Structures are given as structure tokens and as C-alpha cells.
């Protein structure tokens, strides 16, 4: 079985089993960017089912990147309360301030520029590119890693390093099906 066949099977499975994620519904471009940014910060080290109700409340209280950049720290922490890892909230606000100041309130649209923002690393930058900008990029998360290990029968420590797996990720081809 080749990578394209596996990709098609995964997409078919997803189409039939996907769950509703409020940050992936049909949105304006600007809202899609903001919702993706907020959700990716919230999802760092936290399960989707935990994030959903916090995300909905957060977006209702702080509906835009410019509002987030201006929100008082106490208000931000109150809306983040219960999610833990409060450095994520602080970094999210720092990122909003920088985006408002340096990018006119719009997310930068390259992996390299995104990685320069506070709290955004390799995975988050690629996830934002795939979801918010519909780019043909596959971020390496635990699910993709698990599939790669199974497809390539990887067992050795050197075969399961992030660098090695990132080299294998294009086996699946590229798709803009992140949303």
C-alpha cells in the first residue's frame, strides 16, 4: 500500500468519524486565524474534550486578537482558569500584542514567522499553517507519529526520533484537509 492510499483511507475515516470542533467550523478568514491560534494554545498539553467548553467561553468573552492584546492580565487569567499551564495564556497574550503591533492584527503566514512568536514551536506553527491558512503541511503530533511508526514498522530508537519521523511524513503526500 502506498502513501496516497493510506492518506485516502485516513481522510475517508475522518469524514465519517470526525467530531465537532468549534474552532474548525466555517468562519471568516480573520476569525479562522484567531480561533486556530487560541485553540492551538489551549490544546498544548490538554485534551480536546477538556478544551472545548473553555474555548467557547473564552471566544465569547475575548472575541478577537485585538481585544486579546488589550485585555487585562487578571481578566485573561480568569477566563483561562481551570485549564492550567498559565504560561500558555501569558504567551498567547504576548503573541496577540506582537501580532497587533507588527502584523496589523493578522497572523503571519509562514512557519518561520510563527515560530518567532511567544509560545509557538514547530508543531503549533505547522498546525496553524494547515488549519488557518489551508496550507499543505502535516504537523507531526502523537496521532501522525503513531501511524508513521506502524506503516514503517519502526521500533529502533533512532527510527522514532522527531527528525526521522519528520523526514517520513511526506510519504502521505500533502493534503489541505486540515479543516
Predicted regions and their residues:
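Non-catalytic nucleic-acid substrate-recognition regions in nucleic-acid-modifying enzymes
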Residues: 10
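Catalytic cores of DNA base-excision repair glycosylases
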Residues: 4, 13-179
Amino acid at each position: 500500500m502506498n502513501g496516497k492510499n493510506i492518506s485516502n483511507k485516513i481522510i475517508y475515516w475522518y469524514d465519517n468519524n470526525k467530531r465537532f470542533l468549534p474552532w474548525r467550523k466555517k468562519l471568516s478568514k480573520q476569525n479562522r486565524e484567531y480561533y486556530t491560534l487560541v485553540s492551538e494554545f489551549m490544546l498544548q498539553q490538554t485534551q480536546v474534550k477538556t478544551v472545548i467548553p473553555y474555548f467557547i467561553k473564552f471566544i465569547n468573552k475575548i472575541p478577537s486578537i485585538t481585544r486579546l492584546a488589550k485585555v487585562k492580565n487578571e481578566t485573561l487569567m480568569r477566563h483561562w482558569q481551570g485549564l492550567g499551564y498559565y504560561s500558555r495564556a501569558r504567551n498567547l497574550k504576548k503573541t496577540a500584542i506582537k501580532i497587533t503591533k507588527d502584523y496589523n492584527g493578522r497572523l503571519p503566514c509562514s512557519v518561520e514567522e510563527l515560530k518567532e512568536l511567544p509560545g509557538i514551536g514547530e508543531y503549533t506553527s505547522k498546525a496553524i499553517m494547515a488549519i488557518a491558512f489551508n496550507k499543505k503541511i502535516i504537523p507531526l503530533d502523537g496521532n501522525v507519529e503513531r501511524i508513521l511508526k506502524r506503516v514503517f514498522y519502526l521500533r529502533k530508537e533512532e527510527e522514532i526520533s522527531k527528525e526521522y519521523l519528520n523526514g517520513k511524513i511526506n510519504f502521505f503526500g500533502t493534503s489541505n484537509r486540515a479543516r
